[in-house]
Amino acid sequence: MNIQQALNHITKNIHLTQPQMEEIMRSIMQGEATEAQIGALMMGLRMKGESIDEMTAAARVMREFAIKIDVSDIKHLVDIVGTGGDGQNLFNVSTASSFVIAAAGATIAKHGNRGVSSKSGSSDLLEQAGIHLDLDMQQTERCIREMGVGFLFAPNHHKAMKYAAGPRRELGIRSIFNLLGPLTNPAGVKRFVIGVFSDELCRPIAEVMKQLGAEHVMVVHSKDGLDEISLAAPTTIAELKDGEITEWTLNPEDVGIESQTLNGLVVADATASLKLIKDALSKNKSDIGEKAANMIALNAGAGIYVAGITKTYAQAVVFAQDIIYGGQTLEKMSVLAEFTKTLKQSQAD
Protein backbone atom coordinates (compact mmCIF):
# COMPACT_ATOMS: atom_id res chain seq x y z
CA MET A 1 0.00 0.00 0.00
CA ASN A 2 1.36 3.43 -0.90
CA ILE A 3 0.66 6.61 1.04
CA GLN A 4 -1.96 7.84 -1.46
CA GLN A 5 -3.93 4.61 -1.04
CA ALA A 6 -3.58 4.93 2.73
CA LEU A 7 -4.92 8.49 2.63
CA ASN A 8 -7.88 7.25 0.60
CA HIS A 9 -8.63 4.66 3.32
CA ILE A 10 -8.30 7.25 6.06
CA THR A 11 -10.70 9.71 4.37
CA LYS A 12 -13.28 6.90 4.45
CA ASN A 13 -12.65 6.43 8.18
CA ILE A 14 -11.02 3.03 7.61
CA HIS A 15 -8.24 2.04 10.03
CA LEU A 16 -5.00 0.77 8.50
CA THR A 17 -3.78 -2.73 9.43
CA GLN A 18 -0.39 -3.15 11.11
CA PRO A 19 1.31 -4.34 7.87
CA GLN A 20 -0.21 -1.40 5.95
CA MET A 21 0.90 1.14 8.56
CA GLU A 22 4.38 -0.40 8.71
CA GLU A 23 4.68 0.03 4.95
CA ILE A 24 3.57 3.68 5.12
CA MET A 25 5.88 4.44 8.03
CA ARG A 26 8.85 2.88 6.22
CA SER A 27 8.16 5.05 3.18
CA ILE A 28 8.24 8.14 5.43
CA MET A 29 11.42 7.05 7.22
CA GLN A 30 13.15 6.35 3.89
CA GLY A 31 12.28 9.78 2.47
CA GLU A 32 9.87 8.45 -0.14
CA ALA A 33 6.81 10.45 1.02
CA THR A 34 6.44 14.15 0.23
CA GLU A 35 5.92 16.75 2.97
CA ALA A 36 2.36 17.34 1.69
CA GLN A 37 1.62 13.61 2.01
CA ILE A 38 3.08 13.46 5.52
CA GLY A 39 1.05 16.51 6.57
CA ALA A 40 -2.12 14.99 5.11
CA LEU A 41 -1.43 11.71 6.93
CA MET A 42 -0.92 13.57 10.23
CA MET A 43 -4.20 15.46 9.85
CA GLY A 44 -6.15 12.47 8.52
CA LEU A 45 -5.09 10.16 11.35
CA ARG A 46 -5.75 12.88 13.91
CA MET A 47 -9.31 13.44 12.62
CA LYS A 48 -10.07 9.71 12.26
CA GLY A 49 -8.39 8.84 15.54
CA GLU A 50 -5.21 6.75 15.59
CA SER A 51 -5.96 3.04 16.13
CA ILE A 52 -3.99 0.72 18.41
CA ASP A 53 -2.70 -1.18 15.36
CA GLU A 54 -1.63 2.05 13.61
CA MET A 55 0.24 3.32 16.66
CA THR A 56 1.86 -0.06 17.36
CA ALA A 57 3.03 -0.50 13.77
CA ALA A 58 4.35 3.05 13.46
CA ALA A 59 6.23 2.74 16.77
CA ARG A 60 7.71 -0.62 15.76
CA VAL A 61 9.09 0.82 12.50
CA MET A 62 10.40 3.93 14.24
CA ARG A 63 12.19 1.71 16.79
CA GLU A 64 13.60 -0.34 13.91
CA PHE A 65 15.15 2.79 12.33
CA ALA A 66 16.38 4.27 15.64
CA ILE A 67 20.04 4.62 16.61
CA LYS A 68 19.98 2.68 19.86
CA ILE A 69 21.77 2.70 23.20
CA ASP A 70 21.61 -0.59 25.05
CA VAL A 71 21.28 -0.02 28.78
CA SER A 72 18.44 -2.51 29.19
CA ASP A 73 20.56 -4.51 31.67
CA ILE A 74 20.16 -1.73 34.26
CA LYS A 75 17.67 -2.47 37.03
CA HIS A 76 14.93 0.13 37.73
CA LEU A 77 15.39 1.76 34.30
CA VAL A 78 12.51 4.14 33.56
CA ASP A 79 11.31 6.97 31.31
CA ILE A 80 8.77 9.65 32.25
CA VAL A 81 7.48 11.44 29.20
CA GLY A 82 4.49 13.32 27.87
CA THR A 83 3.03 13.50 24.41
CA GLY A 84 2.76 17.28 24.73
CA GLY A 85 -0.05 18.91 22.84
CA ASP A 86 -2.12 19.65 25.95
CA GLY A 87 -1.89 23.37 25.20
CA GLN A 88 -1.50 24.29 28.88
CA ASN A 89 2.13 25.54 28.89
CA LEU A 90 2.87 24.43 32.45
CA PHE A 91 6.46 24.24 33.68
CA ASN A 92 8.19 21.05 32.54
CA VAL A 93 6.88 18.65 35.18
CA SER A 94 8.19 15.40 33.68
CA THR A 95 11.76 16.69 33.34
CA ALA A 96 11.80 18.00 36.92
CA SER A 97 10.36 14.67 38.06
CA SER A 98 13.16 12.80 36.26
CA PHE A 99 15.76 14.15 38.66
CA VAL A 100 13.64 13.21 41.68
CA ILE A 101 13.20 9.67 40.32
CA ALA A 102 16.96 9.38 39.74
CA ALA A 103 17.67 10.66 43.26
CA ALA A 104 15.34 7.91 44.55
CA GLY A 105 17.64 5.23 43.14
CA ALA A 106 16.03 4.52 39.78
CA THR A 107 17.85 5.14 36.50
CA ILE A 108 16.35 7.60 34.03
CA ALA A 109 16.76 7.31 30.26
CA LYS A 110 14.54 10.21 29.26
CA HIS A 111 13.58 10.49 25.63
CA GLY A 112 12.65 14.05 24.66
CA ASN A 113 12.63 16.82 22.13
CA ARG A 114 12.21 20.55 21.79
CA GLY A 115 8.75 22.00 22.30
CA VAL A 116 6.58 21.53 19.21
CA SER A 117 3.19 22.60 20.54
CA SER A 118 4.38 23.86 23.96
CA LYS A 119 6.70 26.66 25.04
CA SER A 120 9.13 24.43 26.90
CA GLY A 121 10.02 20.95 25.66
CA SER A 122 12.38 18.90 27.84
CA SER A 123 15.35 19.72 25.62
CA ASP A 124 14.71 23.47 25.82
CA LEU A 125 14.69 23.25 29.61
CA LEU A 126 17.78 21.06 29.94
CA GLU A 127 19.85 23.39 27.77
CA GLN A 128 18.79 26.27 30.04
CA ALA A 129 20.07 24.20 32.99
CA GLY A 130 23.51 23.84 31.35
CA ILE A 131 23.05 20.18 30.48
CA HIS A 132 24.60 19.34 27.11
CA LEU A 133 22.42 17.21 24.85
CA ASP A 134 24.70 17.11 21.80
CA LEU A 135 26.55 14.06 23.14
CA ASP A 136 27.52 11.00 21.16
CA MET A 137 25.97 7.62 21.96
CA GLN A 138 28.85 6.50 24.18
CA GLN A 139 28.72 9.72 26.22
CA THR A 140 24.96 9.46 26.66
CA GLU A 141 25.36 5.88 27.85
CA ARG A 142 27.97 7.05 30.37
CA CYS A 143 25.51 9.63 31.73
CA ILE A 144 22.88 6.94 32.21
CA ARG A 145 25.25 4.39 33.77
CA GLU A 146 27.42 6.72 35.88
CA MET A 147 25.02 9.55 36.77
CA GLY A 148 21.81 7.53 36.89
CA VAL A 149 20.15 9.98 34.54
CA GLY A 150 20.62 10.61 30.85
CA PHE A 151 18.68 12.41 28.15
CA LEU A 152 18.13 10.96 24.73
CA PHE A 153 17.61 13.92 22.40
CA ALA A 154 15.18 12.48 19.86
CA PRO A 155 16.77 13.95 16.68
CA ASN A 156 20.08 12.26 17.59
CA HIS A 157 18.41 8.84 17.71
CA HIS A 158 15.67 9.16 15.10
CA LYS A 159 17.55 10.65 12.15
CA ALA A 160 14.94 9.36 9.70
CA MET A 161 12.30 11.49 11.43
CA LYS A 162 13.85 14.53 9.74
CA TYR A 163 11.47 13.91 6.85
CA ALA A 164 8.49 14.67 9.11
CA ALA A 165 10.11 17.65 10.86
CA GLY A 166 8.88 20.26 8.35
CA PRO A 167 5.20 19.23 8.35
CA ARG A 168 5.21 18.92 12.16
CA ARG A 169 6.67 22.40 12.58
CA GLU A 170 4.45 24.02 9.95
CA LEU A 171 1.19 22.43 11.10
CA GLY A 172 1.95 22.90 14.81
CA ILE A 173 -0.77 20.44 15.83
CA ARG A 174 -0.60 17.37 18.01
CA SER A 175 -0.41 14.30 15.81
CA ILE A 176 0.61 10.65 15.71
CA PHE A 177 4.22 11.85 15.99
CA ASN A 178 3.48 13.31 19.45
CA LEU A 179 2.23 9.84 20.39
CA LEU A 180 5.24 8.06 18.89
CA GLY A 181 7.85 9.97 20.90
CA PRO A 182 6.97 8.25 24.20
CA LEU A 183 6.60 4.88 22.46
CA THR A 184 10.04 4.85 20.83
CA ASN A 185 12.62 5.25 23.58
CA PRO A 186 15.88 4.03 21.97
CA ALA A 187 17.44 2.70 25.20
CA GLY A 188 15.46 -0.51 25.65
CA VAL A 189 13.35 0.93 28.50
CA LYS A 190 10.42 -1.25 29.58
CA ARG A 191 9.03 0.89 32.44
CA PHE A 192 7.29 4.17 31.71
CA VAL A 193 5.10 6.98 32.92
CA ILE A 194 3.42 8.36 29.80
CA GLY A 195 1.26 11.48 29.83
CA VAL A 196 -1.22 11.75 26.97
CA PHE A 197 -3.31 14.65 25.64
CA SER A 198 -6.70 12.89 25.96
CA ASP A 199 -8.16 10.43 28.46
CA GLU A 200 -9.44 8.45 25.46
CA LEU A 201 -5.80 7.56 24.75
CA CYS A 202 -4.96 6.11 28.19
CA ARG A 203 -6.05 2.53 27.61
CA PRO A 204 -5.06 2.41 23.89
CA ILE A 205 -1.51 3.58 24.69
CA ALA A 206 -1.30 1.00 27.49
CA GLU A 207 -2.41 -1.63 24.93
CA VAL A 208 0.25 -0.44 22.48
CA MET A 209 2.94 -0.62 25.17
CA LYS A 210 1.82 -4.15 26.03
CA GLN A 211 2.21 -5.18 22.37
CA LEU A 212 5.66 -3.54 22.32
CA GLY A 213 6.81 -5.61 25.32
CA ALA A 214 6.71 -3.08 28.18
CA GLU A 215 6.65 -4.39 31.77
CA HIS A 216 5.13 -1.68 33.99
CA VAL A 217 3.52 1.46 32.59
CA MET A 218 1.23 4.19 33.88
CA VAL A 219 -0.54 6.16 31.14
CA VAL A 220 -2.08 9.33 32.56
CA HIS A 221 -4.37 12.22 31.59
CA SER A 222 -6.00 14.63 34.02
CA LYS A 223 -9.59 15.85 33.95
CA ASP A 224 -8.31 19.43 33.58
CA GLY A 225 -6.58 18.46 30.34
CA LEU A 226 -2.95 17.84 31.34
CA ASP A 227 -0.64 15.17 29.94
CA GLU A 228 0.48 14.50 33.52
CA ILE A 229 -0.92 13.81 36.97
CA SER A 230 -2.68 17.00 38.05
CA LEU A 231 -2.65 18.79 41.37
CA ALA A 232 -5.98 20.45 40.52
CA ALA A 233 -8.23 17.64 39.27
CA PRO A 234 -8.67 13.85 39.20
CA THR A 235 -6.36 11.97 36.83
CA THR A 236 -7.39 9.01 34.67
CA ILE A 237 -4.77 6.24 34.74
CA ALA A 238 -4.38 3.07 32.68
CA GLU A 239 -1.76 0.88 34.36
CA LEU A 240 -0.03 -2.03 32.63
CA LYS A 241 1.51 -4.40 35.16
CA ASP A 242 2.24 -8.14 34.95
CA GLY A 243 0.61 -8.24 31.51
CA GLU A 244 -2.71 -6.87 32.79
CA ILE A 245 -4.18 -3.40 32.24
CA THR A 246 -6.23 -1.79 35.00
CA GLU A 247 -7.91 1.60 34.87
CA TRP A 248 -8.31 3.84 37.90
CA THR A 249 -8.79 7.45 38.91
CA LEU A 250 -6.40 9.32 41.19
CA ASN A 251 -7.24 12.32 43.35
CA PRO A 252 -4.30 14.14 45.02
CA GLU A 253 -6.00 13.60 48.41
CA ASP A 254 -5.70 9.82 47.87
CA VAL A 255 -1.97 10.18 48.55
CA GLY A 256 -2.16 12.93 51.19
CA ILE A 257 -1.73 15.98 48.95
CA GLU A 258 -4.31 18.76 48.98
CA SER A 259 -5.80 19.69 45.59
CA GLN A 260 -4.89 23.22 44.47
CA THR A 261 -5.39 25.32 41.36
CA LEU A 262 -2.65 25.50 38.74
CA ASN A 263 -2.36 29.29 39.13
CA GLY A 264 1.31 30.26 39.01
CA LEU A 265 2.46 27.04 37.31
CA VAL A 266 2.08 28.30 33.73
CA VAL A 267 5.37 29.53 32.21
CA ALA A 268 6.26 31.77 29.27
CA ASP A 269 9.39 29.87 28.22
CA ALA A 270 12.15 27.45 29.25
CA THR A 271 13.90 30.12 31.37
CA ALA A 272 10.78 30.66 33.49
CA SER A 273 10.25 26.89 33.70
CA LEU A 274 13.76 26.36 35.08
CA LYS A 275 13.37 29.19 37.60
CA LEU A 276 10.16 27.64 38.95
CA ILE A 277 11.69 24.15 39.09
CA LYS A 278 14.71 25.41 41.04
CA ASP A 279 12.32 27.14 43.46
CA ALA A 280 10.28 23.92 43.86
CA LEU A 281 13.36 21.75 44.46
CA SER A 282 15.12 24.15 46.84
CA LYS A 283 14.92 23.89 50.63
CA ASN A 284 13.39 27.37 50.97
CA LYS A 285 10.42 27.41 48.63
CA SER A 286 8.05 30.23 47.77
CA ASP A 287 4.30 29.49 47.95
CA ILE A 288 4.26 28.84 44.20
CA GLY A 289 7.40 26.70 44.57
CA GLU A 290 5.59 24.66 47.24
CA LYS A 291 2.70 24.11 44.85
CA ALA A 292 5.07 23.08 42.04
CA ALA A 293 6.83 20.68 44.46
CA ASN A 294 3.52 18.93 45.16
CA MET A 295 2.88 18.62 41.43
CA ILE A 296 6.37 17.16 40.94
CA ALA A 297 5.88 14.69 43.83
CA LEU A 298 2.68 13.33 42.28
CA ASN A 299 4.45 12.67 38.97
CA ALA A 300 7.85 11.59 40.29
CA GLY A 301 5.99 9.17 42.55
CA ALA A 302 4.59 7.46 39.47
CA GLY A 303 8.11 7.01 38.07
CA ILE A 304 9.49 5.70 41.36
CA TYR A 305 6.60 3.23 41.54
CA VAL A 306 6.84 1.85 37.97
CA ALA A 307 10.63 1.62 38.35
CA GLY A 308 10.02 -0.91 41.12
CA ILE A 309 11.59 1.13 43.93
CA THR A 310 8.39 0.96 46.03
CA LYS A 311 5.51 -1.50 46.13
CA THR A 312 2.74 1.11 45.89
CA TYR A 313 2.21 4.48 44.27
CA ALA A 314 1.30 6.07 47.62
CA GLN A 315 4.64 4.97 49.13
CA ALA A 316 6.43 6.40 46.11
CA VAL A 317 4.81 9.84 46.49
CA VAL A 318 5.96 10.03 50.12
CA PHE A 319 9.47 9.00 49.04
CA ALA A 320 9.43 11.68 46.32
CA GLN A 321 8.42 14.34 48.87
CA ASP A 322 11.28 13.31 51.18
CA ILE A 323 13.76 13.68 48.32
CA ILE A 324 12.36 17.03 47.16
CA TYR A 325 12.48 18.50 50.66
CA GLY A 326 15.92 17.00 51.32
CA GLY A 327 17.50 18.99 48.49
CA GLN A 328 19.10 16.02 46.69
CA THR A 329 17.35 16.77 43.41
CA LEU A 330 19.01 20.11 42.65
CA GLU A 331 22.36 18.52 43.44
CA LYS A 332 21.60 15.74 40.93
CA MET A 333 20.84 18.37 38.30
CA SER A 334 24.03 20.38 38.85
CA VAL A 335 26.23 17.25 38.96
CA LEU A 336 24.80 16.10 35.62
CA ALA A 337 25.39 19.54 34.08
CA GLU A 338 29.03 19.43 35.21
CA PHE A 339 29.46 15.85 33.97
CA THR A 340 28.10 16.68 30.49
CA LYS A 341 30.32 19.77 30.37
CA THR A 342 33.36 17.60 31.11
CA LEU A 343 32.31 15.12 28.43
CA LYS A 344 31.99 17.92 25.86
CA GLN A 345 35.41 19.33 26.78
CA SER A 346 37.07 15.92 26.43
CA GLN A 347 35.33 15.54 23.06
CA ALA A 348 36.75 18.90 21.93
CA ASP A 349 40.26 17.94 23.10
Curated annotation (Swiss-Prot):
GO cellular component, one term: cytosol
Reactions catalysed: N-(5-phospho-beta-D-ribosyl)anthranilate + diphosphate = 5-phospho-alpha-D-ribose 1-diphosphate + anthranilate
Cofactor entry: Mg(2+)
Binding site for Mg(2+) 2: D227, E228
Record keyword Oxidoreductase present: no
Binding site for Mg(2+) 1: S94, E228
Single GO biological process annotation from the record: L-tryptophan biosynthetic process
Binding site for 5-phospho-alpha-D-ribose 1-diphosphate: 82, 85-86, 92-95, 110-118, 122
Family: Belongs to the anthranilate phosphoribosyltransferase family.
Function of the protein: Catalyzes the transfer of the phosphoribosyl group of 5-phosphorylribose-1-pyrophosphate (PRPP) to anthranilate to yield N-(5'-phosphoribosyl)-anthranilate (PRA).
PANTHER family: ANTHRANILATE PHOSPHORIBOSYLTRANSFERASE
Official protein name in the record: Anthranilate phosphoribosyltransferase
